[in-house]
Amino acid sequence: EFIINTPFRAAWKDYIGNGAVNGKAAVVFAHLITKGVDHGVHAFYVELRDDNGFLPGVGGEDDGVKGGLNGIDNGRLHFANVRIPRTNLLNKYGDVAADGTYTSSIESPGRRFFTMIGTLVQGRVSLDGAAVAASKMALKTAIQYGTERRQFNAASDIREEVLMDYQQHQRRLLPLLATTYAASFAHDELLTKFDDVFSGADDTDENRQD
């Protein structure tokens, strides 16, 4: 059997979907240690609760009011020496025999870890792209409005000034525009590396760890 334990606060997992109230089980990524050797992060199937609440050793709380999506159950989980069967190790990429011997078809720990969490990485990359796209759309609207909307007389008594001619308006928007440009370039670079790894064009341990 394995023992799942989060001995300190930083080992807890926060903002888990269905973690605070509804989830009955979870795939827990934890360091796999056998015979005193840490084989890196692996995935374990862990039951969380039954109809009466959390199972022994499992704890969790709701993450409280968020900035949005408060209809979604988000919570934190922690474990106090929860024992699970050896067969609860999701062992496609690494397995442990009854005597504690570890084997894996992927020799490199970095490559093994990236292979296991590849789907999660893809989700993070997509989230980054969505955030950049949202920033672009918001700034496009704000800057376009600022170049068309006129307000207050300045140099002319006949025609009001466009908002973007005011320094205060520029100072609020242009730094955000520069940051969004930088984020967009960084995201494009990330996508290139991500595609190189997953397509096999440049699948190295260094790129996987990056």
What are the residue ranges of the model-derived segments?
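Flexible, small-/acidic-enriched active-site or ligand-binding loops
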Residues: L55-N81
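A short core secondary-structure module
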Residues: N5-G59
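Charged, glycine-rich active-site and insertion segments that engage polyanionic ligands
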Residues: Q209-D210
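Structural beta-strand/beta-sheet cores of well-ordered domains, especially the beta-sheet scaffolds
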Residues: K24-V28, H39-H42, D73-A80, R86, ...
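A glycine-rich, basic-preceded beta-loop-alpha segment at the flavin cofactor/substrate interface
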Residues: I16-N18, H78-G123, I143-D165
